Amino acid sequence: MLKLLKKETHTPQTERIYKVPLCIQDTIPIYRIAENGIFELEKPTSGSKKGIHQFDRMYLFEDINFSTQDEEEKEDTCSKFETLLRSMNVSYKIIVSNHYADNNKLREEILQKAVSKEMEPLAKEYHKMIGERLEEGRGGLLQSKYFVVSCRKPDYESAKTYFNTIEFSIQQLFHRLGSCLIPLDATERLRALHSYYRMGDEASFSFDWNEYLHLKRDWRNDIINTSLRERPEHLEMEGGTCACVMFVRKYPNGLTDQFLNELTNMNFPIIYTCLLYTSPSPRDRG
């Protein structure tokens, strides 16, 4: 069983502000982006705490071979994973996404990371995993797993320093689980968002950071739909694609690996998000 942390140990880092979007670009919950993949999430408002900004960084992580383990190995994996979660003093979330993939572009971008000697083993391993998944034949769907870390800091440079500080420790913890983390830059994160907003049109994604800076383009226009209609029980997006959101209000004390495996291995696009909060330490309060 995968034991979930007690609810009372989680406290939101900032008071959530729900704003009615005035245009379709406002539905994207991101304020500013940096080339290295660090995103600022909320635009400062008159009601927000002065000098505090919310930033996050996203990583791809490799599968933990959990479903094939015996009971003793599962208990050990769960113990390690719980230790990992409790060691984090920032908010984080785990996202499992079944999406259509522009396979050639995706492989090319992952392999580009092998240019760095530090990232070469991770890039090659993930490239191998992508190939195996595509060979499984799930209607052209690729499953990606993301680990997103958030923090509150007074400015971008402080957030960058913080993420660089904790990144090695997080990667080591995932390595102990038999997994690995690959940090995503801005282009890769936008591609992941594009695969949701423009589902079925993944090959059309095009984003160039230098062009974005030179022309001062709105990056939101590169990923968002041209239309989004709210219906009573679903959202209707461009091209007739429909989506609905289901919220699990209360989890049991534990979830079996079989339940999670069946939930996230559907033969249609699905995004599963597990959002957890931890109380930030005084040092992390900025």
Positions of predicted regions on the chain:
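Extended, folded cores of ATP/NTP-driven motor/assembly subunits in large transport
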Residues: 1-279, 283-286
